[in-house]
């Protein structure tokens, strides 16, 4: 049974049991900022289990794409060397949200394994938590598993509930016992049943884990039963496929074998059991799906983990003799294997291929030099009998040649060498300390606030008359009052001030009453629904309990709103022009501009920029109203609203319809698209691999920009004595004139050089039968110097010549030696002799060479020494 069929049978089986098939969520968790990657099926349902989210179904089943590389779950160093470690894997799961519990979960699992997958019942063993009698009885009395194949697993980690068979989400929250199902490969394979001293062997392989969430643990460790217990199960597709295909290694299943063959094709390796091929086959899956989900290779966070995986794959290809980009060519093979199950992979194939190709090309620029340094260091270490690589060298490889530490460690491990990681960490810490730039620290986290939420009125109002001061902070500490001249954070019960969020800067303005005036320079969130006004008290004394009028800088807010609304229109226009792969990666919206970072692999062409501008300005001219609606998140997404990648949304979301754009957004916006006035892109560039940045301006800023541009065009036209409409034609004429004059100048220089050459020939001194000449040719360029040297060589027949010219404090040198003399006098050595004395260097052929220098004052003495230098070599 092939992996694709196993996946389909799993989902269809649970669908027949009343489960809703839910698509795999992104590898980048949208609901858990503490998690680097989605690493199990339950991640997308975490808020459902916690009661913070509801779904329209109580039973679900998924085939969840998962990654374990980096952070707590890091299998990277083992991948390719063991039978079951992967960076990317698929987790098959079924879930109950307060619906069925242990009995149905156990019976469903047994039915699928024995009746659908046709596994022999006598090959299956199960474990239960040691005091979970309910699960034990279901397995023994209802399913009929013999007692000798049901194993109770206790608290084997030194603390209550610290067991492989007791699952917990964290120190507090939902938790409960679990029951694992194992497959027995038989006595021909070494290993013992779970719980035995030999359990790490390969005979008994865990294939399915059934988690029964039935308790809630509080901060004191007390357990209370959940009113609606839940079920979370997980079965690795690769593991069950290995069992059903009668192989012992996941890399032997059909899915991996096709990728291993493709890796062998691209690297030219015949041995399909080679571990490096397994590494490459595994890594193309992780890399491709991470890019599908918007991760781009970079130097931090998820992007850095992706870069590590890509470069590890490249290094293994390099180890196999592949010294050119190859990894990206495997994307097509992956699409052939998994594109049907995951259409998003097939849709993104060109982009994934391009991102990987660019990353490969970037790494291949340095890998050879870095590998040679590492190989030399390992050879020296081996000769000295050492077993630890210097951490400083590992850091140099990381910092200069782009070798992630684990890639260096990977190479070392193959030689039985370890890396001095503490020394590496010290070097990294020193660099970070040196590179740390001073900047404004926006500290709102850590302020101890336990009062009521702030009521925000800024969507409708620019001022609020009776705002009460409910908290004050000076230098992070809560205070009762603030005096004139002090900087502080003010929390109000009501405010029109928008707090920085979603890329939009916070409002500025004033908090005032008859006796006090507090200038707000920035507005930030103290907590999710608590707004802090940062600024300075300009007069009076401000106390907790005071009532003030809170008024924003309305003109600044209006400019910011124009830019924010333009960002929405630009985002949609970029997707229309460049493709649906465009995803927002960051933004900054303030009163002056909008800065928008997005996923795209190539610079925008002038035509693409013009098309984006035209589309946005069409929307501006349409003067469409901005319509805001608050609705459930699922309804918003089903209605076509764009949810920004990586953002976390609540159950209720704010949807903004603006012209042809529909996005989830909590920012402030124009009432109609016409309020934007004018949209103009002023800059476009790259900020990281696969990430482009566009800056644009709107309204009066855009008008001033166009006016300034128009003024420069008019000034340029006037300087060239042309009308603005004729400017390009006139520039072309001037360029033609310049080329003609340069040609005339070249001819004159050549003629001058010819005449000077005749004069210079007379200055040559004969040394050992060779005419030696070292002279300065005033006003000559490099071409003229070369032509003059050639003519002098023809005229003098046997000669060693150095000619120099000085221009703008720089020295140009040309040396020429005739063929008969070049066996003893090399032009490259001769020109270097002079160049080194004038602060430069150079080189070339034995008969002709050139150099430069930066110290013209030393030129006469350097030329004077040429005769003696040549004489010494003849």
UniProtKB/Swiss-Prot annotation:
<dbReference type="GO" id="GO:0005524">
    <property type="term" value="F:ATP binding"/>
</dbReference>
<comment type="similarity">
    <text>Belongs to the class-II aminoacyl-tRNA synthetase family.</text>
</comment>
<dbReference type="GO" id="GO:0006419">
    <property type="term" value="P:alanyl-tRNA aminoacylation"/>
</dbReference>
<dbReference type="InterPro" id="IPR018164">
    <property type="entry name" value="Ala-tRNA-synth_IIc_N"/>
</dbReference>
<feature type="binding site">
    <location>
        <position position="669"/>
    </location>
    <ligand>
        <name>Zn(2+)</name>
    </ligand>
</feature>
<dbReference type="GO" id="GO:0045892">
    <property type="term" value="P:negative regulation of DNA-templated transcription"/>
</dbReference>
<dbReference type="InterPro" id="IPR012947">
    <property type="entry name" value="tRNA_SAD"/>
</dbReference>
<comment type="function">
    <text>Catalyzes the attachment of alanine to tRNA(Ala) in a two-step reaction: alanine is first activated by ATP to form Ala-AMP and then transferred to the acceptor end of tRNA(Ala). Also edits incorrectly charged Ser-tRNA(Ala) and Gly-tRNA(Ala) via its editing domain.</text>
</comment>
<dbReference type="InterPro" id="IPR018163">
    <property type="entry name" value="Thr/Ala-tRNA-synth_IIc_edit"/>
</dbReference>
<dbReference type="InterPro" id="IPR023033">
    <property type="entry name" value="Ala_tRNA_ligase_euk/bac"/>
</dbReference>
<keyword id="KW-0067">ATP-binding</keyword>
<dbReference type="GO" id="GO:0005829">
    <property type="term" value="C:cytosol"/>
</dbReference>
<dbReference type="GO" id="GO:0002161">
    <property type="term" value="F:aminoacyl-tRNA deacylase activity"/>
</dbReference>
<dbReference type="InterPro" id="IPR018162">
    <property type="entry name" value="Ala-tRNA-ligase_IIc_anticod-bd"/>
</dbReference>
<feature type="binding site">
    <location>
        <position position="564"/>
    </location>
    <ligand>
        <name>Zn(2+)</name>
    </ligand>
</feature>
<keyword id="KW-0694">RNA-binding</keyword>
<dbReference type="Pfam" id="PF01411">
    <property type="entry name" value="tRNA-synt_2c"/>
</dbReference>
<dbReference type="InterPro" id="IPR009000">
    <property type="entry name" value="Transl_B-barrel_sf"/>
</dbReference>
<keyword id="KW-0479">Metal-binding</keyword>
<dbReference type="GO" id="GO:0008270">
    <property type="term" value="F:zinc ion binding"/>
</dbReference>
<dbReference type="InterPro" id="IPR045864">
    <property type="entry name" value="aa-tRNA-synth_II/BPL/LPL"/>
</dbReference>
<keyword id="KW-0030">Aminoacyl-tRNA synthetase</keyword>
<feature type="binding site">
    <location>
        <position position="665"/>
    </location>
    <ligand>
        <name>Zn(2+)</name>
    </ligand>
</feature>
<dbReference type="GO" id="GO:0000049">
    <property type="term" value="F:tRNA binding"/>
</dbReference>
<dbReference type="InterPro" id="IPR050058">
    <property type="entry name" value="Ala-tRNA_ligase"/>
</dbReference>
<keyword id="KW-0648">Protein biosynthesis</keyword>
<dbReference type="InterPro" id="IPR003156">
    <property type="entry name" value="DHHA1_dom"/>
</dbReference>
<keyword id="KW-0547">Nucleotide-binding</keyword>
<keyword id="KW-0862">Zinc</keyword>
<dbReference type="Pfam" id="PF07973">
    <property type="entry name" value="tRNA_SAD"/>
</dbReference>
<dbReference type="Pfam" id="PF02272">
    <property type="entry name" value="DHHA1"/>
</dbReference>
<feature type="binding site">
    <location>
        <position position="568"/>
    </location>
    <ligand>
        <name>Zn(2+)</name>
    </ligand>
</feature>
<protein>
    <recommendedName>
        <fullName>Alanine--tRNA ligase</fullName>
        <ecNumber>6.1.1.7</ecNumber>
    </recommendedName>
</protein>
<dbReference type="InterPro" id="IPR002318">
    <property type="entry name" value="Ala-tRNA-lgiase_IIc"/>
</dbReference>
<keyword id="KW-0436">Ligase</keyword>
<keyword id="KW-0963">Cytoplasm</keyword>
<dbReference type="InterPro" id="IPR018165">
    <property type="entry name" value="Ala-tRNA-synth_IIc_core"/>
</dbReference>
<keyword id="KW-0820">tRNA-binding</keyword>
<dbReference type="GO" id="GO:0004813">
    <property type="term" value="F:alanine-tRNA ligase activity"/>
</dbReference>
């Amino acid at each position: 049974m092939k992996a694709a069929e196993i996946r389909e049978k799993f989902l269809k089986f649970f669908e027949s049991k009343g489960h809703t098939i839910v698509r795999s969520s992104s590898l980048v968790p949208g609901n858990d900022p503490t998690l680097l990657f989605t690493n199990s099926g339950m991640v997308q349902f975490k808020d459902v289990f916690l009661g913070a989210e509801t779904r329209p179904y109580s039973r679900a089943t998924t085939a969840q794409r998962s990654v374990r590389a980096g952070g707590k779950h890091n299998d990277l160093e083992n991948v390719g060397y063991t039978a079951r470690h992967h960076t990317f894997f698929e987790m098959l799961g079924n879930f109950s949200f307060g619906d069925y519990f242990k009995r149905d979960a156990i019976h469903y699992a047994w039915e699928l394994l024995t009746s659908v997958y046709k596994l022999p019942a006598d090959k299956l063993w199960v474990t239960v938590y040691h005091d979970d009698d309910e699960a034990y009885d279901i397995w023994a009395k209802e399913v009929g598993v013999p007692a000798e194949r049901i194993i109770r697993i206790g608290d084997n980690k030194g603390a209550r509930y610290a067991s492989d068979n007791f699952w917990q989400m964290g120190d507090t929250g939902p938790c409960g016992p679990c029951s694992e199902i194992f497959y027995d490969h038989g006595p021909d394979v070494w290993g013992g049943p779970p719980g035995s001293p030999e359990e790490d062997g390969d005979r008994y392989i865990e294939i399915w884990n059934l988690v029964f969430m039935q308790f809630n643990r509080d901060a004191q460790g007390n357990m209370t039963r959940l009113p609606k217990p839940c079920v979370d199960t997980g079965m690795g597709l690769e593991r069950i496929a290995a069992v059903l295909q009668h192989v012992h290694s996941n890399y032997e299943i059909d899915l991996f074998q096709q990728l291993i063959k493709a890796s062998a094709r691209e690297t030219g390796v015949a041995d399909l059991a080679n571990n490096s091929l397994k590494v490459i086959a595994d890594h193309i899956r992780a890399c491709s799906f991470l890019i599908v989900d918007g991760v781009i290779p970079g130097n931090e966070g998820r992007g850095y983990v992706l870069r590590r995986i890509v470069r590890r794959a490249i290094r293994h290809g390099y180890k196999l003799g592949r010294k050119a980009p190859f990894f990206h060519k495997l994307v097509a093979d992956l699409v052939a294997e998994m594109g049907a199950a995951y259409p998003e992979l097939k849709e993104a194939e060109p982009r994934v291929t391009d991102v990987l190709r660019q990353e490969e090309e970037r790494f291949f620029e340095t890998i050879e030099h870095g590998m040679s340094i590492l190989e030399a260091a390992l050879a020296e270490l081996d000769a000295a009998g050492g077993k630890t690589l210097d951490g400083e060298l590992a850091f140099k490889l990381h910092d200069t040649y782009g070798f992630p530490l684990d890639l260096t460690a990977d190479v070392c491990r193959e030689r039985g060498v370890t890396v001095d990681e503490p020394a590496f960490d010290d070097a990294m810490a020193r660099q970070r300390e040196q590179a740390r730039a001073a900047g404004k620290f926006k500290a709102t986290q850590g302020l101890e606030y336990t009062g009521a939420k702030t009521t925000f009125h800024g969507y409708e109002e620019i001022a609020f008359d009776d705002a009460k001061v409910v908290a004050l902070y000076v230098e992070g500490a809560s205070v009762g009052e603030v005096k004139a001249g002090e900087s502080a954070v003010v929390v109000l019960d009501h405010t029109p001030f928008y707090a920085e969020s979603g890329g939009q800067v916070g409002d500025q303005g004033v908090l005032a009453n008859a006796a006090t005036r507090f200038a707000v320079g920035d507005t930030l969130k103290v907590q999710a629904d608590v707004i802090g006004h940062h600024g300075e008290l300009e007069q009076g004394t401000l106390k907790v309990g005071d009532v003030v009028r809170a008024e924003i800088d309305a003109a600044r807010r209006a400019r910011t709103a124009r830019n924010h609304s333009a960002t929405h229109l630009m985002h949609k226009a970029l997707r229309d022009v460049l493709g649906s792969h465009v995803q927002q990666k960051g933004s900054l919206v303030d009163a002056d501009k909008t800065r928008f970072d997005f996923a795209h692999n190539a610079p925008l062409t002038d035509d693409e920029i013009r098309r984006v501008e035209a589309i946005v300005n069409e929307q501006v001219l349409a003067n469409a109203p901005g319509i805001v609606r608050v609705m459930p998140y699922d309804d918003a997404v089903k209605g076509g609203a764009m949810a920004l990648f990586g953002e976390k949304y609540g159950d209720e979301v704010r949807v903004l319809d603006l012209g042809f754009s529909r996005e989830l957004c909590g920012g402030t916006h124009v009432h109609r698209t016409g309020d934007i006035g004018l949209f103009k892109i002023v800059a476009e560039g790259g900020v990281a691999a696969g990430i482009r940045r566009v800056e644009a301006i709107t309204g009066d800023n855009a008008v001033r920009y166009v006016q300034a541009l128009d003024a420069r065009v008019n000034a340029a036209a006037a300087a060239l004595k042309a009308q603005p409409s004729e400017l390009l034609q006139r520039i072309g004429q001037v360029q033609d004139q310049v080329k003609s004059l340069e040609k005339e100048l070249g001819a004159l220089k050549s003629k001058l050089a010819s005449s000077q050459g005749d004069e210079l020939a007379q200055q040559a001194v004969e040394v050992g039968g060779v005419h030696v000449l070292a002279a300065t040719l005033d006003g000559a360029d490099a071409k003229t110097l070369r032509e003059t040297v050639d003519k002098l060589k023809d005229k003098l027949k046997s000669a060693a010549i150095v000619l120099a010219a000085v221009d703008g404090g720089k020295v140009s040198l040309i040396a020429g030696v005739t063929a008969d003399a070049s066996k003893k006098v090399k032009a490259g050595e001769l020109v270097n002799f002079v160049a080194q004395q004038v602060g430069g260097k150079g080189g070339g052929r034995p008969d002709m060479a050139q150099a430069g220098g930066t110290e013209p004052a030393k030129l006469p003495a350097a030329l004077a020494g040429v005769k003696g230098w040549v004489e010494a070599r003849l």
